[in-house]
Amino acid sequence: VPTTDGLYLGLISGTSADGIDAALVRFEAGHPSLVAGLTHPWDDTLRRRILAVAQDEDRLALDDYGRLDVAVAHAFTDAARAVLDKAKVSHTAVTAIGSHGQTIRHRPDGPLPFTLQIGDPSVIAERSGIDTVADFRRADVAAGGQGAPLVPAFHATVLRPENGARVVLNLGGIANVTRLSAGGDVTGFDTGPANGLMDAWCLRHRGEAFDRDGRFAASGRIDAALLAELLDDAYFVLPPPKSTGREHFHLAWLDTHPRVADNTPEDVQATLLALSAVSIADAIERYAGDASDVVACGGGVHNAALIRALAERLPGRELVTSSVFGIDPDFMEAMAFAWLAYRRLRGEPGNLASVTGARGPRLLGALYAAP
Protein backbone atom coordinates (compact mmCIF):
# COMPACT_ATOMS: atom_id res chain seq x y z
CA VAL A 1 0.00 0.00 0.00
CA PRO A 2 1.48 3.41 -0.92
CA THR A 3 2.09 5.75 1.99
CA THR A 4 0.42 8.71 0.17
CA ASP A 5 1.11 10.92 3.19
CA GLY A 6 1.14 14.65 2.49
CA LEU A 7 -1.36 17.47 1.99
CA TYR A 8 -5.01 16.89 1.10
CA LEU A 9 -7.84 19.38 0.73
CA GLY A 10 -11.39 18.57 1.87
CA LEU A 11 -14.42 20.48 0.55
CA ILE A 12 -18.05 20.24 1.66
CA SER A 13 -21.22 22.28 1.70
CA GLY A 14 -23.83 20.82 4.03
CA THR A 15 -27.61 20.64 3.79
CA SER A 16 -27.98 24.23 5.04
CA ALA A 17 -25.71 25.47 2.20
CA ASP A 18 -24.43 28.13 4.61
CA GLY A 19 -20.97 28.16 3.00
CA ILE A 20 -18.33 25.86 1.53
CA ASP A 21 -16.04 24.50 4.23
CA ALA A 22 -12.47 23.99 3.02
CA ALA A 23 -9.84 22.21 5.10
CA LEU A 24 -6.18 21.76 4.18
CA VAL A 25 -5.03 18.65 6.05
CA ARG A 26 -1.57 17.14 6.49
CA PHE A 27 -1.30 13.36 6.90
CA GLU A 28 1.79 12.04 8.68
CA ALA A 29 1.92 8.29 9.26
CA GLY A 30 -1.81 8.34 8.61
CA HIS A 31 -2.51 10.90 11.33
CA PRO A 32 -4.43 14.00 10.14
CA SER A 33 -3.80 17.54 11.33
CA LEU A 34 -5.48 20.74 10.15
CA VAL A 35 -3.11 23.15 8.41
CA ALA A 36 -5.76 25.75 7.53
CA GLY A 37 -9.53 25.97 7.29
CA LEU A 38 -12.06 28.51 6.12
CA THR A 39 -15.70 28.83 5.14
CA HIS A 40 -16.10 30.32 1.69
CA PRO A 41 -19.40 32.21 1.28
CA TRP A 42 -21.88 31.29 -1.44
CA ASP A 43 -23.02 33.86 -3.93
CA ASP A 44 -26.46 34.71 -2.51
CA THR A 45 -28.36 34.01 -5.75
CA LEU A 46 -26.64 30.63 -6.14
CA ARG A 47 -27.34 29.69 -2.50
CA ARG A 48 -31.04 30.49 -2.86
CA ARG A 49 -31.18 28.39 -6.02
CA ILE A 50 -29.53 25.43 -4.29
CA LEU A 51 -31.95 25.63 -1.35
CA ALA A 52 -34.97 25.93 -3.65
CA VAL A 53 -33.85 22.84 -5.59
CA ALA A 54 -33.03 20.85 -2.43
CA GLN A 55 -36.43 21.68 -0.92
CA ASP A 56 -38.20 20.76 -4.17
CA GLU A 57 -39.53 24.31 -4.60
CA ASP A 58 -37.65 24.51 -7.91
CA ARG A 59 -38.14 21.68 -10.43
CA LEU A 60 -34.97 21.91 -12.50
CA ALA A 61 -35.01 21.60 -16.26
CA LEU A 62 -32.07 19.49 -17.47
CA ASP A 63 -30.26 22.51 -18.90
CA ASP A 64 -30.56 24.29 -15.55
CA TYR A 65 -29.31 21.19 -13.72
CA GLY A 66 -26.22 21.05 -15.94
CA ARG A 67 -25.44 24.72 -15.41
CA LEU A 68 -25.98 24.48 -11.63
CA ASP A 69 -23.61 21.48 -11.50
CA VAL A 70 -20.86 23.58 -13.11
CA ALA A 71 -21.63 26.75 -11.11
CA VAL A 72 -21.26 24.79 -7.85
CA ALA A 73 -17.94 23.36 -9.11
CA HIS A 74 -16.68 26.89 -9.80
CA ALA A 75 -17.61 27.93 -6.24
CA PHE A 76 -15.89 24.84 -4.78
CA THR A 77 -12.73 25.62 -6.77
CA ASP A 78 -12.79 29.18 -5.44
CA ALA A 79 -13.01 27.78 -1.90
CA ALA A 80 -10.02 25.50 -2.55
CA ARG A 81 -7.97 28.42 -3.90
CA ALA A 82 -8.94 30.58 -0.91
CA VAL A 83 -7.72 28.08 1.68
CA LEU A 84 -4.46 27.56 -0.26
CA ASP A 85 -3.95 31.34 -0.33
CA LYS A 86 -4.62 31.51 3.41
CA ALA A 87 -2.03 28.78 4.08
CA LYS A 88 0.40 30.21 1.49
CA VAL A 89 0.63 26.77 -0.10
CA SER A 90 0.94 26.09 -3.84
CA HIS A 91 -1.62 23.83 -5.52
CA THR A 92 1.32 21.69 -6.67
CA ALA A 93 1.98 20.68 -3.04
CA VAL A 94 -1.49 19.11 -2.64
CA THR A 95 -1.85 15.38 -3.37
CA ALA A 96 -5.62 15.45 -3.89
CA ILE A 97 -8.87 17.24 -3.21
CA GLY A 98 -11.73 15.32 -1.60
CA SER A 99 -14.92 17.06 -2.73
CA HIS A 100 -18.23 16.07 -1.20
CA GLY A 101 -20.17 18.43 -3.47
CA GLN A 102 -23.60 19.83 -2.65
CA THR A 103 -26.38 17.34 -1.91
CA ILE A 104 -29.57 18.23 -3.74
CA ARG A 105 -31.40 14.94 -3.18
CA HIS A 106 -30.91 11.97 -0.86
CA ARG A 107 -33.30 9.03 -1.31
CA PRO A 108 -31.51 5.95 0.01
CA ASP A 109 -34.70 3.92 0.55
CA GLY A 110 -37.19 2.41 -1.89
CA PRO A 111 -36.80 0.09 -4.90
CA LEU A 112 -34.36 2.39 -6.77
CA PRO A 113 -32.34 4.15 -4.06
CA PHE A 114 -30.11 7.07 -5.00
CA THR A 115 -28.22 10.07 -3.67
CA LEU A 116 -27.32 13.10 -5.75
CA GLN A 117 -24.49 15.56 -5.16
CA ILE A 118 -23.57 18.30 -7.63
CA GLY A 119 -20.34 20.22 -8.27
CA ASP A 120 -18.71 18.68 -11.37
CA PRO A 121 -15.39 17.19 -10.17
CA SER A 122 -13.89 17.36 -13.69
CA VAL A 123 -14.29 21.14 -13.51
CA ILE A 124 -12.70 21.27 -10.03
CA ALA A 125 -9.72 19.17 -11.17
CA GLU A 126 -9.26 21.26 -14.32
CA ARG A 127 -9.57 24.67 -12.65
CA SER A 128 -7.57 23.84 -9.49
CA GLY A 129 -4.85 21.78 -11.15
CA ILE A 130 -5.27 19.19 -8.35
CA ASP A 131 -6.38 15.56 -8.72
CA THR A 132 -9.90 15.40 -7.30
CA VAL A 133 -11.74 12.54 -5.61
CA ALA A 134 -15.52 12.94 -5.53
CA ASP A 135 -18.85 11.07 -5.60
CA PHE A 136 -18.25 9.43 -2.23
CA ARG A 137 -21.78 8.36 -1.34
CA ARG A 138 -23.11 6.42 -4.31
CA ALA A 139 -20.91 3.32 -3.94
CA ASP A 140 -22.33 2.79 -0.45
CA VAL A 141 -25.92 3.24 -1.70
CA ALA A 142 -25.22 0.79 -4.55
CA ALA A 143 -24.10 -1.71 -1.88
CA GLY A 144 -27.44 -1.41 -0.08
CA GLY A 145 -26.31 1.27 2.37
CA GLN A 146 -27.73 4.65 3.30
CA GLY A 147 -24.74 6.48 1.81
CA ALA A 148 -24.72 8.48 5.06
CA PRO A 149 -23.46 9.39 7.50
CA LEU A 150 -19.88 8.88 6.26
CA VAL A 151 -18.11 10.99 8.89
CA PRO A 152 -18.35 8.37 11.71
CA ALA A 153 -15.50 6.42 10.08
CA PHE A 154 -13.32 9.52 10.48
CA HIS A 155 -14.60 10.07 14.04
CA ALA A 156 -13.42 6.54 14.85
CA THR A 157 -9.94 7.38 13.53
CA VAL A 158 -9.44 10.57 15.54
CA LEU A 159 -11.72 10.32 18.61
CA ARG A 160 -12.02 6.66 19.65
CA PRO A 161 -11.82 6.56 23.49
CA GLU A 162 -9.21 4.50 25.34
CA ASN A 163 -11.94 2.99 27.50
CA GLY A 164 -15.71 3.16 27.83
CA ALA A 165 -17.96 4.72 25.21
CA ARG A 166 -18.18 8.16 23.63
CA VAL A 167 -20.66 9.97 21.40
CA VAL A 168 -19.54 12.34 18.66
CA LEU A 169 -22.39 14.69 17.78
CA ASN A 170 -22.25 16.55 14.49
CA LEU A 171 -24.54 19.59 14.48
CA GLY A 172 -24.95 20.52 10.83
CA GLY A 173 -28.21 21.18 9.00
CA ILE A 174 -29.01 17.64 10.12
CA ALA A 175 -27.66 16.12 13.35
CA ASN A 176 -25.83 12.83 13.36
CA VAL A 177 -24.42 10.82 16.22
CA THR A 178 -21.53 8.38 16.27
CA ARG A 179 -21.09 5.91 19.13
CA LEU A 180 -17.46 4.97 19.66
CA SER A 181 -16.09 2.45 22.13
CA ALA A 182 -12.60 1.24 22.96
CA GLY A 183 -13.44 -2.05 21.24
CA GLY A 184 -16.31 -3.15 19.04
CA ASP A 185 -18.32 -1.74 16.19
CA VAL A 186 -18.81 1.91 15.41
CA THR A 187 -22.46 2.86 15.02
CA GLY A 188 -23.93 6.12 13.82
CA PHE A 189 -26.99 7.64 12.19
CA ASP A 190 -28.81 10.87 11.46
CA THR A 191 -31.08 11.80 14.37
CA GLY A 192 -33.10 14.47 12.49
CA PRO A 193 -32.84 18.27 12.37
CA ALA A 194 -30.05 20.26 14.02
CA ASN A 195 -29.73 23.72 12.44
CA GLY A 196 -31.49 23.24 9.11
CA LEU A 197 -35.09 23.96 10.10
CA MET A 198 -34.07 26.79 12.43
CA ASP A 199 -31.94 28.35 9.67
CA ALA A 200 -34.79 28.15 7.16
CA TRP A 201 -37.32 29.62 9.62
CA CYS A 202 -34.86 32.40 10.53
CA LEU A 203 -34.36 33.22 6.83
CA ARG A 204 -38.11 33.35 6.26
CA HIS A 205 -38.90 35.58 9.24
CA ARG A 206 -35.68 37.52 9.86
CA GLY A 207 -34.00 37.50 6.45
CA GLU A 208 -30.88 36.11 8.17
CA ALA A 209 -29.15 32.87 7.18
CA PHE A 210 -28.94 31.58 10.77
CA ASP A 211 -29.99 32.38 14.33
CA ARG A 212 -26.87 33.97 15.85
CA ASP A 213 -26.22 32.44 19.31
CA GLY A 214 -29.81 31.14 19.25
CA ARG A 215 -31.10 34.58 20.31
CA PHE A 216 -34.23 34.39 18.12
CA ALA A 217 -35.13 31.03 19.73
CA ALA A 218 -34.26 32.31 23.21
CA SER A 219 -36.73 35.19 22.75
CA GLY A 220 -39.65 32.76 22.31
CA ARG A 221 -41.47 30.14 24.33
CA ILE A 222 -41.81 26.45 23.49
CA ASP A 223 -45.29 25.35 22.38
CA ALA A 224 -45.43 21.90 24.01
CA ALA A 225 -48.36 20.75 21.87
CA LEU A 226 -46.59 21.72 18.63
CA LEU A 227 -43.39 20.08 19.85
CA ALA A 228 -45.29 16.83 20.50
CA GLU A 229 -46.78 16.97 16.98
CA LEU A 230 -43.36 17.50 15.40
CA LEU A 231 -41.81 14.67 17.44
CA ASP A 232 -44.61 12.40 16.20
CA ASP A 233 -42.90 12.21 12.80
CA ALA A 234 -42.22 8.59 11.81
CA TYR A 235 -38.51 9.25 11.21
CA PHE A 236 -37.78 9.67 14.92
CA VAL A 237 -38.87 6.12 15.78
CA LEU A 238 -37.16 4.40 12.82
CA PRO A 239 -34.33 2.18 14.03
CA PRO A 240 -30.84 2.79 12.60
CA PRO A 241 -29.22 2.54 10.09
CA LYS A 242 -31.05 5.63 8.85
CA SER A 243 -30.28 8.96 7.23
CA THR A 244 -32.32 12.00 6.31
CA GLY A 245 -31.98 15.48 4.89
CA ARG A 246 -33.58 18.65 3.70
CA GLU A 247 -35.95 16.76 1.40
CA HIS A 248 -37.75 15.52 4.53
CA PHE A 249 -37.24 18.15 7.25
CA HIS A 250 -37.98 21.40 5.42
CA LEU A 251 -40.38 24.34 5.80
CA ALA A 252 -43.13 22.69 3.74
CA TRP A 253 -43.04 19.78 6.25
CA LEU A 254 -43.22 22.27 9.11
CA ASP A 255 -46.11 24.14 7.48
CA THR A 256 -48.23 20.96 7.38
CA HIS A 257 -48.65 21.33 11.17
CA PRO A 258 -51.59 23.72 11.75
CA ARG A 259 -50.32 24.93 15.14
CA VAL A 260 -47.38 26.65 13.40
CA ALA A 261 -49.71 29.35 12.08
CA ASP A 262 -51.15 29.91 15.58
CA ASN A 263 -47.74 30.83 17.04
CA THR A 264 -45.45 33.85 16.84
CA PRO A 265 -42.29 33.33 14.76
CA GLU A 266 -40.09 33.39 17.87
CA ASP A 267 -42.24 30.76 19.62
CA VAL A 268 -41.94 28.49 16.57
CA GLN A 269 -38.16 29.04 16.58
CA ALA A 270 -37.99 28.15 20.28
CA THR A 271 -40.01 25.01 19.53
CA LEU A 272 -37.73 24.06 16.61
CA LEU A 273 -34.71 24.38 18.89
CA ALA A 274 -36.44 22.11 21.40
CA LEU A 275 -37.22 19.64 18.58
CA SER A 276 -33.51 19.42 17.74
CA ALA A 277 -32.43 19.10 21.38
CA VAL A 278 -35.08 16.54 22.37
CA SER A 279 -34.66 14.33 19.28
CA ILE A 280 -30.86 14.34 19.64
CA ALA A 281 -30.93 13.61 23.39
CA ASP A 282 -33.52 10.83 22.92
CA ALA A 283 -31.37 9.21 20.23
CA ILE A 284 -28.30 9.31 22.46
CA GLU A 285 -30.21 7.85 25.43
CA ARG A 286 -31.68 5.08 23.27
CA TYR A 287 -28.65 4.01 21.23
CA ALA A 288 -25.61 5.24 23.17
CA GLY A 289 -26.85 5.24 26.74
CA ASP A 290 -23.49 3.97 28.01
CA ALA A 291 -21.51 6.96 26.71
CA SER A 292 -19.92 9.11 29.40
CA ASP A 293 -19.09 12.07 27.18
CA VAL A 294 -20.55 13.80 24.12
CA VAL A 295 -18.12 15.55 21.77
CA ALA A 296 -19.90 18.15 19.63
CA CYS A 297 -18.77 19.55 16.28
CA GLY A 298 -20.32 21.39 13.34
CA GLY A 299 -21.82 24.85 13.04
CA GLY A 300 -24.38 24.19 15.79
CA VAL A 301 -21.67 24.42 18.46
CA HIS A 302 -21.92 28.21 18.04
CA ASN A 303 -25.63 28.23 18.92
CA ALA A 304 -25.36 28.87 22.66
CA ALA A 305 -29.09 28.24 23.22
CA LEU A 306 -28.90 24.84 21.48
CA ILE A 307 -25.84 23.78 23.48
CA ARG A 308 -27.57 24.82 26.74
CA ALA A 309 -30.70 22.87 25.78
CA LEU A 310 -28.64 19.77 24.97
CA ALA A 311 -26.68 19.98 28.22
CA GLU A 312 -29.96 20.16 30.19
CA ARG A 313 -31.25 17.03 28.43
CA LEU A 314 -28.02 15.05 28.79
CA PRO A 315 -27.51 15.07 32.57
CA GLY A 316 -24.58 13.07 33.85
CA ARG A 317 -22.72 13.29 30.54
CA GLU A 318 -19.88 15.67 29.82
CA LEU A 319 -20.70 17.83 26.79
CA VAL A 320 -17.59 19.32 25.15
CA THR A 321 -16.59 20.43 21.65
CA SER A 322 -14.00 18.66 19.53
CA SER A 323 -11.58 21.56 20.13
CA VAL A 324 -10.81 19.85 23.47
CA PHE A 325 -9.16 17.13 21.33
CA GLY A 326 -7.40 19.61 19.05
CA ILE A 327 -9.91 19.37 16.19
CA ASP A 328 -11.62 22.57 15.08
CA PRO A 329 -15.38 21.82 15.33
CA ASP A 330 -16.08 23.94 12.24
CA PHE A 331 -13.89 21.80 10.00
CA MET A 332 -14.43 18.23 11.24
CA GLU A 333 -16.53 17.33 8.18
CA ALA A 334 -14.22 18.98 5.65
CA MET A 335 -11.30 17.14 7.28
CA ALA A 336 -13.27 13.91 6.95
CA PHE A 337 -13.54 14.34 3.17
CA ALA A 338 -9.81 15.04 2.93
CA TRP A 339 -9.37 11.77 4.85
CA LEU A 340 -11.76 9.94 2.50
CA ALA A 341 -9.67 11.13 -0.48
CA TYR A 342 -6.56 9.86 1.34
CA ARG A 343 -8.26 6.48 1.89
CA ARG A 344 -9.28 6.30 -1.77
CA LEU A 345 -5.74 6.90 -3.03
CA ARG A 346 -4.50 4.18 -0.67
CA GLY A 347 -7.11 1.76 -2.02
CA GLU A 348 -8.76 1.50 1.41
CA PRO A 349 -12.53 1.41 2.04
CA GLY A 350 -14.15 4.57 3.37
CA ASN A 351 -17.52 3.38 4.65
CA LEU A 352 -18.50 1.52 7.81
CA ALA A 353 -21.18 -1.07 7.10
CA SER A 354 -22.12 -0.98 10.81
CA VAL A 355 -23.14 2.66 10.29
CA THR A 356 -24.63 2.78 6.79
CA GLY A 357 -26.09 -0.72 6.53
CA ALA A 358 -24.13 -1.50 3.34
CA ARG A 359 -23.35 -5.11 2.47
CA GLY A 360 -19.71 -4.53 3.34
CA PRO A 361 -16.73 -2.20 3.08
CA ARG A 362 -16.41 -0.34 -0.23
CA LEU A 363 -13.92 1.95 -1.91
CA LEU A 364 -15.64 5.34 -1.93
CA GLY A 365 -15.20 8.03 -4.56
CA ALA A 366 -13.86 8.24 -8.08
CA LEU A 367 -10.63 9.94 -9.13
CA TYR A 368 -10.72 12.83 -11.61
CA ALA A 369 -7.23 13.62 -12.85
CA ALA A 370 -5.93 17.17 -13.09
CA PRO A 371 -4.25 18.21 -16.36
Predicted feature locations:
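Non-transmembrane, aqueous-exposed alpha-helical and coiled segments at domain scale
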Residues: 2, 91, 268, 283, ...
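Glycine-rich phosphate-binding/hydrolytic loop that grips phosphoryl groups
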Residues: 13, 17, 274, 323-370
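Glycine-rich phosphate-binding loops at beta-strand->alpha-helix junctions
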Residues: 291-313
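Short helix-loop-beta connector
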Residues: 2-5, 90-93, 162-164, 288-292
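Gly/Thr-rich phosphate-binding beta-strand-loop-beta motif of the actin/hexokinase/Hsp70
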Residues: 2-40, 165-182
